[in-house]
Swiss-Prot record:
Its main location: nucleus. It catalyses: guanosine(46) in tRNA + S-adenosyl-L-methionine = N(7)-methylguanosine(46) in tRNA + S-adenosyl-L-homocysteine. Its EC number is 2.1.1.33. GO terms for molecular function: tRNA (guanine(46)-N7)-methyltransferase activity; tRNA binding. The gene is Mettl1. This is tRNA (guanine-N(7)-)-methyltransferase. Expressed in testis and ovary (at protein level). Ubiquitously expressed in all testicular cells throughout spermatogenesis. The active site is at D160. Changing L157A: Abolishes methyltransferase activity and is unable to rescue male fertility phenotype in mutant flies. It comes from Drosophila melanogaster.
Length: 256
């Protein structure tokens, strides 16, 4: 079996001084101030990742100790940040396995530690055994983790807008990647997008609507989805937008 996230290798290479990462005495959860990192990471850079050669090589049991024979990950939160929405998914869908994928090493470390703390705190109920996080570059390695038609839902919440025109190719929604997403998303599955940047929202909608394998949900359909209200402030980035009274731009698409 291969390691799934490459965290240990990257941490060894960074050679950063050891820093205590104390948990909160009140909540028992890790404190984000000990895991701070720049807001975004270059997805094109040659990061060092340990990734599986094929989905069959992923050691899911190391992330989901209670996983059942034949059970698969159903939901993927791409660029999960500090894991707020991932935790919400675990609470809303206890019977489903959800994975958060994050490229930034300290941020993914925080989510891993947060999930471990939640599991310890809820040891008597077994809650949060259905969520996990791994560090990887989703723009490069998603097909290495998921088989065709595996995912029911994919989430792209507040992705890096890459404002400069020369960097638009780095946006996680583009025609080439949409075909990869369509490959791992089952027919009828949903792809959720949320941003506070109107230009990026228009870019997403244009590219999604131009792709033959997606159709946008109507406003009525989107509002009827029980997940929709959670998209606005379950994630840390979404909560910040709410605090700053910013705009939210939502678009949900169905895999045809």
């Amino acid at each position: 079996m291969v390691a799934t996230g490459g965290q240990a290798q990257d941490q060894g290479q960074n050679q950063e001084p050891d820093v205590l990462n104390p948990t909160s005495a009140v909540t028992g959860l890790p404190q984000k101030r000990y895991y701070r990192q720049r807001a975004h990471s270059n997805p094109i850079a040659d990061h060092s990742f340990d990734y599986p050669a094929r989905p069959e090589d992923v050691d899911w049991r190391s992330m989901y100790p209670g996983i059942q024979q034949g059970q698969q990950v159903s939901f993927a939160d791409i660029g999960c940040g500090y894991g707020g929405f991932l935790v919400t998914l675990g609470e809303m869908f206890p019977e489903k396995l959800s994975i958060g994928m994050e490229i930034r090493v300290k941020v993914s470390d925080y989510v891993v530690d947060r999930i471990a703390a939640l599991r310890r705190r809820c040891a008597d109920t077994g809650a949060y055994q259905n969520i996990a996080c791994l560090r990887t570059n989703a723009m490069k390695y998603l097909p290495n983790y998921f088989v065709k038609g595996q995912l029911e839902k994919m989430f792209f919440l507040y992705p890096d807008p890459h404002f400069k025109r020369a960097k638009h190719k780095w946006r996680i929604i583009n025609q080439a990647l949409l075909s990869e997403y369509a490959y791992i998303l089952r027919k009828g599955g949903l792809l959720y997008t949320m941003t506070d940047v109107e230009d990026l929202h228009k870019w997403i909608v244009t590219h999604m609507e131009e792709h033959p394998l997606y159709e946008r949900l109507t406003e009525e359909e989107a509002n009827a989805d029980p997940i929709t209200p959670k998209l606005y402030q379950s994630s840390e980035e979404g909560a910040k937008v709410v605090r700053n009274k910013g705009d939210h731009f939502l678009a949900i698409f169905r895999r045809l």
